[in-house]
Amino acid sequence: MNKNIKYSQNFLTSEKVLNQIIKQLNLKETDTVYEIGTGKGHLTTKLAKISKQVTSIELDSHLFNLSSEKLKLNIRVTLIHQDILQFQFPNKQRYKIVGSIPYHLSTQIIKKVVFESHASDIYLIVEEGFYKRTLDIHRTLGLLLHTQVSIQQLLKLPAECFHPKPKVNSVLIKLTRHTTDVPDKYWKLYTYFVSKWVNREYRQLFTKNQFHQAMKHAKVNNLSTITYEQVLSIFNSYLLFNGRK
């Protein structure tokens, strides 16, 4: 692999695996797709065959030039040479996002596509352990993401599917946007609440009596088995106790 390639990327080259991924994406001929990381253009080419338009964002200069040459005659593909973390997704246009993201930037990128885009569906190839962390409502990331999207695994991708072979397995996941569980006017309060909640700084949020009432109202018997819905209930109690509702 070229030494200048950014973010230590691992590439999917197997036609069989690429086709399996495409089948899971549920894209239509009318769909506009934003792809994170053009890479060598293998997935980009297949995306363009089943969608209306693909805008693919690639930071690495070597890969951008390589894919530009490969895809220059494909009228359905637009390539952009930019860092995805600096890219601005459109506000009004309907679109979906697809991407295989660098493992060590997973948190930054998933926050970017969930909180700074209006994509209805987001398909990401991520490290398997990271996927599990997105579901963990005892972590900040899980509690933030769940307010905007539902997350599900679509496909397991063993390390052998990639070149060079990584040390971990990956999965294809789908994030489906739903109506937000936390209105914009309460978002800053929610992020503050979450920061204290995951660190078990309950006294920063409630008096002893308030905490007992909030837990009772949410029907929480054991904090270790608490659900996302129960955390939301406790947050609503926090708002009420602070005169925000």
Curated annotation (Swiss-Prot):
It comes from the Bacteria. Gene3D superfamilies: Ribosomal RNA adenine dimethylase-like, domain 2, Vaccinia Virus protein VP39. It is an enzyme of class 2 (transferase). S-adenosyl-L-methionine binds at residues 10, 12, 37, 58, 83, 100. GO terms for molecular function: 23S rRNA (adenine(2085)-N(6))-dimethyltransferase activity; RNA binding; rRNA (adenine-N6,N6-)-dimethyltransferase activity. Keywords: Antibiotic resistance, Methyltransferase, RNA-binding, S-adenosyl-L-methionine, Transferase, Transposable element. This protein produces a dimethylation of the adenine residue at position 2085 in 23S rRNA, resulting in reduced affinity between ribosomes and macrolide-lincosamide-streptogramin B antibiotics. GO terms for biological process: response to antibiotic. GO terms for cellular component: cytosol. InterPro entries: KsgA/Erm (IPR001737), rRNA_Ade_diMease-like_C (IPR023165), rRNA_Ade_Mease_Trfase_CS (IPR020596), rRNA_Ade_methylase_Trfase_N (IPR020598), SAM-dependent_MTases_sf (IPR029063). Belongs to the class I-like SAM-binding methyltransferase superfamily. rRNA adenine N(6)-methyltransferase family. CDD domains: AdoMet_MTases. This is rRNA adenine N-6-methyltransferase. It catalyses: adenosine(2085) in 23S rRNA + 2 S-adenosyl-L-methionine = N(6)-dimethyladenosine(2085) in 23S rRNA + 2 S-adenosyl-L-homocysteine + 2 H(+). Its EC number is 2.1.1.184.
